[in-house]
């Protein structure tokens, strides 16, 4: 059996009562105090996640911008230095290699933050598709990454840094920011639907920053609540809402797919065609009317006919209802449409509802 990978924070997990699981080959905390309590802490106060398992890939060189324009669906030329952008990397078929965030450090240097389980695959794909004068380096092992999320995130982080956090706009970042005596990159971003920051630091210093933030009375948060939080906010999870068989258009991520950008990009032709012909299926929100929780891969029916599949589902701690995301035949995606979800050997009534399920008050 292959030994599970561990983040630089791993030695501290036991001290804070973590219960760990195998997540894409990593030994990561699924929970600390409990999923519901952790979820509520992030929605009402603040919580701290160890996300050091995420991959970081450095792209450098005079042709970095044009290379990323070719590789990614969003418009890289629109990113200013000190800003980040959500992006999709596609295959020629329009299916998804990964979803990721691009940080622009300078005109010739970018960092791509990718999903942990996809890091090696993404890196190989990027190297295979290199164009022009660029270098591509997997620097994942050099970085620790923490996410401080919740309405009080700014107030808490301000105690540990001199950086004026209020001046960092959404998807903006600052480099060389001192946090608890450690040089970091602070980005105003996250995966919870709340305000918050993602903080990058050298791996060796990650534990120090982790404990300094927890010492401010912040709850440590595991993967269980990370999933319920992102699901309420309808943020895609690779392997569920996105895959090599699911295009970003089907997943409703049109805002990150710039079909009109001048640059040709991998998958552009297939995506243009899919848009012109019209989508056969699309991602919708569902809420169960009867008892039961929709889970990944459960079938969705209408009058005995299978019309789609659940990609993610949970009991929503914020709403108290059972919710899910499902890829459904476009003909049946009207809000209010009643459907049934196959849960074990039973068909359970559900309806299509508007998304996101949760949106924070500005």
From Swiss-Prot:
GO biological process: glycine decarboxylation via glycine cleavage system
NCBIfam families for the chain: gcvT, PRK00389.1
UniProt cross-references to PANTHER family, sorted A to Z: AMINOMETHYLTRANSFERASE, AMINOMETHYLTRANSFERASE, MITOCHONDRIAL
Catalytic activity: N(6)-[(R)-S(8)-aminomethyldihydrolipoyl]-L-lysyl-[protein] + (6S)-5,6,7,8-tetrahydrofolate = N(6)-[(R)-dihydrolipoyl]-L-lysyl-[protein] + (6R)-5,10-methylene-5,6,7,8-tetrahydrofolate + NH4(+)
Quaternary data: The glycine cleavage system is composed of four proteins: P, T, L and H.
Family: Belongs to the GcvT family.
MF terms in GO: aminomethyltransferase activity; transaminase activity
Gene giving rise to this polypeptide: gcvT
Name of the protein in its database record: Aminomethyltransferase
Primary role: The glycine cleavage system catalyzes the degradation of glycine.
Matching InterPro entries: GCS_T, GCS_T_bac, GCST_C, GCV_T_N, GcvT/YgfZ/DmdA, GcvT/YgfZ_C, TrmE/GcvT_dom1
Record keywords: Aminotransferase, Transferase
The keyword Transcription is annotated on this UniProt entry: no
Superkingdom of source: Bacteria
Pfam families: GCV_T, GCV_T_C
EC numbers on record: 2.1.2.10
Gene3D superfamilies documented for this protein: Aminomethyltransferase beta-barrel domains, Aminomethyltransferase fragment, Probable tRNA modification gtpase trme, domain 1
A GO cellular component entry from the record: cytosol
């Amino acid at each position: 059996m292959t030994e599970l990978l561990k983040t630089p924070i791993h030695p501290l997990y036991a001290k804070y009562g973590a219960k760990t699981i195998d997540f894409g080959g990593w030994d990561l905390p699924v929970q600390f105090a409990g999923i519901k309590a952790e979820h509520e802490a992030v929605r009402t106060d603040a919580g701290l996640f160890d996300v050091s398992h995420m991959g970081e890939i450095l792209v450098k060189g005079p042709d970095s911008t044009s290379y990323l324009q070719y590789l990614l669906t969003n418009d890289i030329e629109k990113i200013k230095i000190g800003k980040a952008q959500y992006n999709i990397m596609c295959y020629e078929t329009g299916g998804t290699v990964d979803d990721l965030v691009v940080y622009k450090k300078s005109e010739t240097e970018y960092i791509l933050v990718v999903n942990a389980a996809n890091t090696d695959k993404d890196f190989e794909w990027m190297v295979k598709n290199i164009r022009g004068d660029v270098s591509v380096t997997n620097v994942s092992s050099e970085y620790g990454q923490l996410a401080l999320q919740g309405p009080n995130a700014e107030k808490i982080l301000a105690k540990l840094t001199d950086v004026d956090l209020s001046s960092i706009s959404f998807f903006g970042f600052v480099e060389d920011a001192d946090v608890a005596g450690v040089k970091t990159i602070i980005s105003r971003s996250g995966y919870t639907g709340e305000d918050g920051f993602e903080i990058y630091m050298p791996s060796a210093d990650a534990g120090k920053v982790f404990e300094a933030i927890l010492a401010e009375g912040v709850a440590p948060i595991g993967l269980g609540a990370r999933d319920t939080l992102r699901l309420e906010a309808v943020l895609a999870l690779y392997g569920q809402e996105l895959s090599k068989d699911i295009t970003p258009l089907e997943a409703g991520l049109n805002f990150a797919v710039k079909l009109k950008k001048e640059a040709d990009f991998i998958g552009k032709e297939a995506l243009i065609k899919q848009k012109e012909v019209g989508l056969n299926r699309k991602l919708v929100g569902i809420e169960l009317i009867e008892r039961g929780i929709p889970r990944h891969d459960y079938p969705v029916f209408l009058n005995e006919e299978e019309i789609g599949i659940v990609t993610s589902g949970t009991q929503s701690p914020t709403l108290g209802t059972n919710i899910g995301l499902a890829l459904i035949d476009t003909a049946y995606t009207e809000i209010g449409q009643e459907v049934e979800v196959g849960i074990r050997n039973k068909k359970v009534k559900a309806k299509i509802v508007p998304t996101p399920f949760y949106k924070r008050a500005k």
